[in-house]
Amino acid sequence: MNLTKIVNTSRKIQLSAFLLLTTLLCYSQTGQIVSDSIQSKSLAHTITQENPVRQLAIYLPPGYAASTKRFPVLYLLHGIGDTYEEFSGDTIKNNNIKDLMDAGIVANKFEEMIIVMPNENTNLFGSFYTNSSVTGNWEDFTALELVDFIDTKYRTIAKASSRAIAGHSMGGFGALTLAMKHPDIFSVTYGMNAALICFCGEVTPNNPAIVKSVKAKNIGELLATQSSIAVGLLTVAQAFSPNPSKPPFYVDKPFKMQGTKAVPDPEAYNKWVASNPVQMAERYKANLLKLKAIKFDLGNDDEYRFITENNRLFSRKLTMLKIPHQFEEYNGDHRNRLWGLDGRIYNDMLSFVYDNFGK
């Protein structure tokens, strides 16, 4: 009997068992959502009295607490009327970012990353992630202040090749346009059901909701319309055509009444046209070509027709400009295919983002 061989074999078995146990323990760990806040200079002293202290939900992967390594970062932007709780607040299993990230890491679908979810709602329901003379400089806050804050406080890989920006609806608009403007900060972008605003679909002067929005003289009248399109028109106007001298909305509306009909008001209307990503693509072609990866998608039964129409137009424009991108239509509406282990966030967005990070 070879006792030495038996002892060595026993040690190998023990070592293998130890390594297996360590691996299982590692995979059994979960990430965590931490709450944080940032005092923003870009959002201080606004006409609409927005809160300059912005709340954040931040997903830290399992390995964050267990190591000293640095991680790539995804900035994830919410839609109009929502906050970061769109992604972090649901307690239903696999209906929140933490559950999906933890599941994907264990399944080796993607690896660990930090996800930053800021609250960029405004008093009129949404910033559209743009600089506004009325609600504040949300583009500067997101792309400059917030990124610097996260890189300073958390163990990030602080370079564009390890940063992505994605979002849903209004957040999809923000993700695509901020990446378009700041390829030195973000290298990957993904817009889910992106609310690419255009004068198409519901956003036309023959829509009764548009007429109601144009006629509304105060917040009470606006909310009484009970129309997301009517309210949304004013929300977008605070982003695209703000006017600090015109209370109570502090906007130039893109339409005006001419008799009983709404017609374009040229100055404000043209500002909206210039803020349409289809038009922006021409101006930012060089920047778009610097991005490593661009993707956007939509449910072909989206309740908002302007989203369907303008996402298709945006893809055609990028194709015409020879800008590499992925555009996908799927069977679904504005929200019903986002969540769960069979949903778009888990199977498409998170995987796409991680696969395109600089390794």
Regions found by a protein language model. Name each.
Residues 29-359:
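Non-catalytic cap/lid and distal C-terminal segments of serine-dependent acyl enzymes
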Residues 1-31:
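Bacterial Sec-dependent N-terminal signal peptides
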